[in-house]
Amino acid sequence: MVRCSCVLFRKYGNFIDNLRLFTKGGSGGMGYPRLGGEGGKGGDVWVVAHNRMTLKQLKDKYPQKRFVAGEGANSRVSALKGSKGKDCEIPVPVGVSVTDENGKIIGELNKEKDRLLVAEGGLGGKLLTNFLPLKGQKRVIHLDLKLIADIGLVGFPNAGKSSLLSKISHAKPAIADYAFTTIKPELGKIMYSDFKQISVADLPGLIEGAHMNKGMGHKFLKHIERTKQLLFVVDISGFQLSSQTHYRTAFETIILLSKELELYKEELHTKPALLAVNKMDLPDAQGKFHVLMNQLQNPKEFFHLFEKNMIPERTVEFQHIIPISAITGEGIDELKNCIRKSLDEHTNQENDAYHKKQLLNLHISNTVSYSEPPSKTAVSSPRMDIT
């Protein structure tokens, strides 16, 4: 019987994926009631996405984490219309979600130069405000980073994800023979001969209870949300976190990983998934792989090995299952080809769906335009009587 085990709490180290900031729009400028002059509007506070920015850089550069825009200029005889206050721009990494103090999403920045208004400047003094300026908006915001990658590596600690990433890309993650080698996300790119690039994210190892924020919990799982596809990486010989925890076979790790994703967010199961069975260079690996394939073909026949609360509602259906060895390089080329094929198929499906939607909208638009009754205000042609 498979049981949930207690796990250790870990930190990301120097990696930061959330930050709390105070923002304030600038106050408006004074109006000039005698001449009807209007004060300038206060500056706005914007969050702007930059590819080379990190939240740690932002925190180090602005340790006070306060961002206030400039005040609008007062109206005066030589300039009755006061100039607008200087805007304040907060540089953030691409992939940031911005929420307010109540957790309400203000917006997301998913590509370079995306901009989001987070605190508006106050109006300048004018007739409407009795020529008195208004204060700028005050707002506490939370920046939450979710990595954007084509492929997200999913697996228990020490499954060989970091070794695999270094083998298929130019990334150089920390690699060692103990659990939790990866304590912060690592990004790499697979380069193909036709110059196609596919980004891969190696995330800290998932553990049982991650959906309840155990271990790295939500810090790990939230990054999976923005990957296009998932690549499960399992050790063919199984996994055991420590001598105090239960040993898991390769099949058990797949089922438990699937359950953790399901409990965190069900739609993660809708993502296309591949499975890389690692460490095939070990003794008896071929025999264990044969057993694993049989179990994956008929997973429900083996659910009696699990506690009821650890059985997923639906099991992950892998598009490709590839036996590999990140050490010897066995199966690496096949894996890269399968990743490329799977992503290309997914892109084609998305494009087809988009074109069908556009055609449907066009058809509906044309149908509505043809069926519209004549306008009541339309002028009818004059009747001509021929005598």
Swiss-Prot record:
Keyword match Coiled coil: no
Protein's cellular compartments: Nucleus, Nucleolus
Keywords: GTP-binding, Nucleotide-binding, Nucleus, Ribosome biogenesis
Regions crossing the membrane: none
Domain Obg: 13-148
GO cellular component, one term: nucleolus
OBG-type G domain ranges (all copies): 149-344
Signal peptide segment: none
CDD domains: Obg
One Pfam family matching this protein: MMR_HSR1
SUPFAM superfamilies the UniProt entry points to: Obg GTP-binding protein N-terminal domain, P-loop containing nucleoside triphosphate hydrolases
Domain of life: Eukaryota
Record-level GO BP terms: ribosome biogenesis
Binding site for GTP: 155-162, 202-206, 278-281
MF terms (GO), sorted A to Z: GTP binding; GTPase activity; magnesium ion binding
Role, per record: May be involved in the ribosome maturation process.
Family: Belongs to the TRAFAC class OBG-HflX-like GTPase superfamily. OBG GTPase family.
Record-given protein name: GTP-binding protein 10
Taxonomic lineage: Eukaryota, Metazoa, Chordata, Craniata, Vertebrata
